[in-house]
Amino acid sequence: MNSEGGKPGNVLTVNGNYTGNNGLMTFNATLGGDNSPTDKMNVKGDTQGNTRVRVDNIGGVGAQTVNGIELIEVGGNSAGNFALTTGTVEAGAYVYTLAKGKGNDEKNWYLTSKWDGVTPADTPDPINNPPVVDPEGPSVYRPEAGSYISNIAAANSLFSHRLHDRLGEPQYTDSLHSQGSASSMWMRHVGGHERSRAGDGQLNTQANRYVLQLGGDLAQWSSNAQDRWHLGVMAGYANQHSNTQSNRVGYKSDGRISGYSAGLYATWYQNDANKTGAYVDSWALYNWFDNSVSSDNRSADDYDSRGVTASVEGGYTFEAGTFSGSEGTLNTWYVQPQAQITWMGVKDSDHTRKDGTRIETEGDGNVQTRLGVKTYLNSHHQRDDGKQREFQPYIEANWINNSKVYAVKMNGQTVGREGARNLGEVRTGVEAKVNNNLSLWGNVGVQLGDKGYSDTQGMLGVKYSW
């Protein structure tokens, strides 16, 4: 069927009957809409047996089909089975299957980017009930779209954090008053699991991540003997592995991202002595990542991403009351409203896959807004008098808004993540001052959105001051 130069448009005519014996037939086609140029096979008589079909895409960018691209026309009894060697063929954001037509076209075979309700086979084994084109069905998107979306979302959020994520309870550094400025080093580990959907619910993605961040204060000082300032540096390593499964095609896609960050942070506390009043925290990071997207029996795609993320956070701590416990604990209850704005400017490099698909991700420049309240109990037991030991369990609730949707354009067709524009979050954890030098903190939290979006994570941090 292949002509010199590989241009589609050849027609193979069989004047009699055709019997397939698991042979292979290759067609060239420019995959797009119904009227796309393609090689064709025209059987005047009957068909029977099984035939493997390979379709080479010649410059097609993918598009929605209605009836499909006619590949095989049958004039007589259409009892033969034709199946793609790979189960599907892809162009742009779309997945094409080989299916029989409907109505007056029920004898013919078409390449369709519409879902027919039948998952295509990964191998061209004989099929008793071949798929049928459904002109009213939804278009089918490639699972790779979910991997690109997961990677760009991770690149912008892996190192995003809050004041107490980074430093636990900064006011546990009490040696400032008695010994001058205190230096400190801190480290935190984060593990998380995210579930999301894309492409009108077709693509289901699960992702597991790990984050390591560490840093230290360069300076601490007070401007009026009551407030306190922190200035420090930080760096980190993170990775994430995602898996996207389509509920309409028979193959899946894997996304991987790993990279580093480095930057600065600065924090101001209004009233260090009473641990109340306002605070303002800010940080900025430069981030760089290596990314890959791979799928079953298809070429892997490697690319990089770079960019800056930055945040400003503020809050106000109220002392809500004090009380003594039955076992000799002195408890002080605090309430702390918080607000945070994070700018996420990490961008993937626009590029073209080996299969000719142009990849452009969206969502960089997202502004994430968080509004919430944290309430915690500072507890000190009598037996810890003189030991500088304190424990601070807490719970917080947040509303999170993202100004942009993370998405990917594949040859100009946009597929976006769903359900993550507005999120509700609950966290609970504990911050502990073990002694005058060592502090520990940890928490677990869950975020819930629309359309099945969820994110669960746990964190453990440690800080040593001297």
From Swiss-Prot:
One Pfam family named in its UniProt record: AC_1
Spans traversing the lipid bilayer: none
InterPro entries, alphabetized: AC_1, Autotransporte_beta, Autotransporte_beta_dom_sf, Autotransporter_pectin_lyase_C, Bact_Autotransporter_VF, OM_autotransptr_brl_dom, Pectin_lyase_fold/virulence
Highest taxon in the source lineage: Bacteria
Domain Autotransporter as annotated: residue spans: 178-466
CDD domains, alphabetized: PL2_Passenger_AT (cd01344)
GO annotation, cellular component aspect: outer membrane
Protein name per UniProt: Uncharacterized protein YdeU
Lineage, top ranks: Bacteria, Pseudomonadati, Pseudomonadota, Gammaproteobacteria, Enterobacterales
